[in-house]
Amino acid sequence: RNILLVLGAIALIASYIADIRVPHPGMEIQEVRQPVERTSKDGFQKRNVIVTQVIDGDTVFIKDDEGKEASFHLLGIDAPERKQAYGAQSAEHLKRILEDVDYHVQVIFRSKDQYGRIVGKLVADGKDLNLDQIKTGNAWVYKNYLRDLQPGDKNLYMKAEENARANRIGLWADPNPQNPREWRREHPRN
């Protein structure tokens, strides 16, 4: 009985080996490059994309290698709306950073939100733009979604907001800036 198992295993291995093609001199080898979608242990995917439009300080449109366009929301932050105080400033700050890298960024994401937007981290030349929006006083930490951040980002984001508040950076120069959630409640979309 053991002999049959061993013979079966050998036959299986032999069938796999027979299917392997070894290049020989003069054989033409074609290299096929396809975009690789990398997924980390915690379920986050990484993709290189181009930002095609900045909507506000926490939402952009992106286009991937295949030309597919999607709305992308910066995870863990809530920036002022465009018509809200500091809204235009927040969007312009994000746009200036993106101009410096010709709008080429990496997105690190795991899911979509209830509005169909991809939600994740925007990275330009290794710089976390979500974190930068907080550090420069152009966004709040969106505390409702801290659990969705990558490990380690929660503390960085919280400390960045504390520092921006303490040093009255950006919107924190205002003694009483209005949280975007409150502003949206007072100004519902039709």
Predicted regions, residues:
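Small beta-barrel nucleic-acid-binding modules, primarily SNase/OB-fold domains
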Residues: 1-190
